[in-house]
Design a protein with these regions (language model features):
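Beta-strand/loop-dominated core regions that host nucleotide or nucleotide-derived cofactor-binding catalytic loops
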Residues: 264-267, 274-298
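Short amphipathic alpha-helical patches
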Residues: 50-51, 114-115, 254, 275-282
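Catalytic alpha/beta core domains of metabolic enzymes, predominantly
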Residues: 3-234, 238-241
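Nucleotide-binding motor/catalytic cores of P-loop/tubulin-like NTPases across gene-expression machines
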Residues: 245-251, 255-275
């Protein structure tokens, strides 16, 4: 966002929407309508609020540009899938969105099957959400399924619960599943992951990571795995792992610590918005990140 927008709105959904609307008004004035709106965030609450506000503002101004949905830098594995399902599912269930992307730090072909599942379940999810909302008791949302695939259950539960948790209609989640294909611990872990993705309750570290592109000059998936393993014993951290300096500094600003590719074989480390170490050899970077985390934790204690 520009300094002008930041000074008036701050880093908020309102600022993101107004920044976008300024360009759309120019497009309308010039009768240029070949536009798709992609307005994303790695925070699902911000992402959902921003897209909703964008849709309302376009309607007020008589615009009807298509909306592209996605949770940017969602990560990888089941956490990346759940976070994407929470954000995208909340909006699809409200009839918003014309195209979607599930942004995963994995091979590109892994994204499409997940996106197809979200689209296929969207209408059913909207109906289930309406029914589930009526059953919320003392802030606890209970969802019941009969799934044999853990991934399918995770995606459906994340879509069904997302908007209700983001909007504060529930503050806890219980997931039930018929049969013995999915164990009770997996159901609890899924509920915890959904609560964290919706920013309701944090039970483990959060990792923000990009899907990688031609600018990424190190093995992103391998590095994410190494950082996750090295920080597994820590709690409550938000770590951004970004492939390059184009999007990296902006994304790490919202994280406690950032690991950003700087050049071939080189990495820079961030503590929030501040770059602490530049151009570290890649083979030393994970250990130096751990040292930075430990030093920061010691200063705060």
């Amino acid at each position: 966002l520009s300094d002008r927008i930041m000074s008036r709105y701050g880093d908020t959904p309102e600022g993101m929407v107004e920044s976008c609307m300024e360009f759309l008004r120019v497009c309308v004035d010039e009768q240029f309508t070949n536009v798709v709106i992609s307005i994303k965030a790695s925070n699902t609450v911000v992402m959902v609020q921003t897209v909703r506000l964008m849709a309302r503002q376009m309607e007020r101004e008589g615009m009807a540009f298509p909306l592209h949905l996605g949770v940017t830098e969602a990560g990888e594995g089941e956490d990346g899938r759940i976070k994407s399902a929470v954000g995208i599912g909340a909006l699809l269930g409200e009839g918003l969105g014309d195209t979607i992307r599930v942004s995963l730090s994995e091979e590109p072909e892994c994204e499409i099957p997940v996106a197809r599942k979200l689209v296929a379940y969207a209408e059913q999810s909207a109906e289930k959400r309406a029914i589930a909302e009526q059953g919320i008791c003392d802030g606890v949302l209970t969802l019941a399924y009969a799934e044999t695939s853990l991934e399918d259950l995770q995606l459906k539960a994340a879509m069904d619960a997302g908007a209700l948790l983001i909007d504060g209609k529930a503050h806890d989640l219980v997931i039930l599943n018929d049969g013995d294909a999915i164990g009770s611990q997996a159901l609890k872990d899924t509920a915890d992951a959904i609560l964290q993705a919706a920013r309701v309750r944090f039970t483990k570290n959060e990792y923000i990571s990009c899907p990688g592109c031609g600018r990424t000059l190190y093995n992103l998936q391998e590095t994410i795995a190494r950082i996750k393993a090295a920080t597994a014993g820590m709690k409550g951290l938000k770590i951004a792992i970004m492939g390059c300096i184009v999007n990296g500094p902006g994304e790490v600003a919202d994280a406690d610590f950032g690991y950003v590719g700087a050049a071939r074989g080189k990495v820079s480390l961030y503590r929030r918005k501040e770059c602490i170490e530049k151009n570290i050899p890649e083979e030393e970077a994970v250990e130096r990140l751990l040292q930075l985390i430990e030093a920061t934790t010691s200063q705060q204690s």
